[in-house]
Regions:
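Active-site and donor-binding regions of nucleotide-sugar-utilizing enzymes
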Residues: 18-139
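Short hydrophobic helices that act as membrane-entry/anchoring signals
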Residues: 2-25
């Protein structure tokens, strides 16, 4: 029951906040270009790239965590060069930093919205061997 209530409240809360998000995206520019990733919608090229290897999903919430995640991924790649890393972030600033420093073999995405249909779609698409949460934020 609580899970259903959470999902209903999250959905309507998101709809209520959507105008604010859209205004922010318009002001910042470029932020909207990957907005569909929040819904688990990825370009065909990106989906093809995901088929290139065994995937480890690394989630870094913001800038500080991105630096930790990039170091972790680099060190792990030295041991397991066959792995493909999928790095997700929550903020546009963290995304921009990761974009500049991420290994070309890896994939950078925005973290999906916390709704069951979206999370299932992302898990089906990414099909990760493991998920590494650099820092977990539970609200």
């Amino acid at each position: 029951m609580i899970w259903i209530l959470y999902n209903v409240l999250f959905f309507f809360g998101f709809l209520l906040m959507l105008p604010k998000f859209l205004l922010r995206m318009r002001r910042r520019g470029g932020y909207a270009r990957n907005f569909t990733q929040r819904f688990g919608r990825y370009s065909p090229d990106l989906v093809r790239k995901l088929d290139e290897g065994r995937r480890i999903w690394v989630h870094a919430v913001s800038v500080g965590e991105v630096f930790v995640a990039l170091k972790l991924m680099k060190d792990w790649r030295a041991i397991r060069p066959d792995l493909l890393f999928v790095l997700t972030t929550n903020t546009s600033t963290a995304h921009a930093i990761a974009e500049k420093q991420l290994d070309a073999r890896d994939v950078l995405l925005y973290f999906p919205l916390d709704l069951p249909q979206i999370v299932h779609r992302v898990l089906d698409t990414l099909d990760p061997l493991a998920l590494i949460l650099v820092e977990l934020e539970l609200w």
